[in-house]
Amino acid sequence: MSELLDHVASCRLPTEWGVFTMHGFEEANGQEHVALTVGNCSDGNPVLTRIHSECLTGDALFSRKCDCGPQLEAAMRAVQAEGRGIIVYLRQEGRGIGLINKIRAYHLQEQGMDTVEANLALGLPVDARDFRLAQSIYEYLGIRSVKLLTNNPEKIQTLKDAGINVVERIPLHVGENLENERYLQTKADKLGHLMSE
């Protein structure tokens, strides 16, 4: 399919928010990723989309330390309401550092570090994700133009650099609470996330 990913399977996926088609993709190293689609996404019109990085703690365990779970739910609801769209779910836990390192970083955050300081203290990158994987998925699905649900300007730039036309950025401000207030502020202050619109 592309130099980054191969499409390996698709199936129907009924969820709390409606029925999606789930597409499975695999990197050469065996790492798996999925995309959830609704409707005809390859008709040339801009497609509502979210690039979501795996977050076991937020997506599956309902942690209040981040806004990931509420963002995923809001994106799934928005795509269903639109009647067409795609959610790219990249298996890049903990901004790409992995689950165990994320737990280590959480421990350092409990001692007063913010999310960026904790990653650096562990000798890890602040953000190790590769959003080019999303471009490979869009390519397979025939998507060239998107309306992107994101607060992260890096996702926008990566898609533009890959030749995807980002016609609109749609802010995704959900899941704020007292437990993740500092985390969200750090994302704005140190990672450039667009949190105030």
From Swiss-Prot:
Enzymatic reactions: GTP + 4 H2O = 2,5-diamino-6-hydroxy-4-(5-phosphoribosylamino)-pyrimidine + formate + 2 phosphate + 3 H(+)
GO aspect biological process, one term: riboflavin biosynthetic process
Enzyme kind, highest EC tier: hydrolase
Any GO MF annotation of the entry: zinc ion binding
GO cellular component terms listed in the entry, alphabetical order: cytosol
Key word Zinc present: yes
Keywords from the named record: GTP-binding, Hydrolase, Metal-binding, Nucleotide-binding, Riboflavin biosynthesis, Zinc
Residue numbers annotated as active site: D127, R129
Gene3D superfamilies xrefs: GTP cyclohydrolase II (3.40.50.10990)
Positions that bind GTP: R50, I51, H52, S53, E54, Q71, E93, G94, R95, T115, T150, K155
Cofactor(s) needed for function: Zn(2+)
EC number(s) on file: 3.5.4.25
Taxonomy, superkingdom: Bacteria
Pathway where this protein functions: Cofactor biosynthesis; riboflavin biosynthesis; 5-amino-6-(D-ribitylamino)uracil from GTP: step 1/4
Pfam families noted in UniProt: GTP_cyclohydro2
Cofactor binding note: Binds 1 zinc ion per subunit.
Residues at which Zn(2+) binds: C55, C66, C68
Family the entry assigns: Belongs to the GTP cyclohydrolase II family.
Protein name: GTP cyclohydrolase-2
GN (gene name): ribA
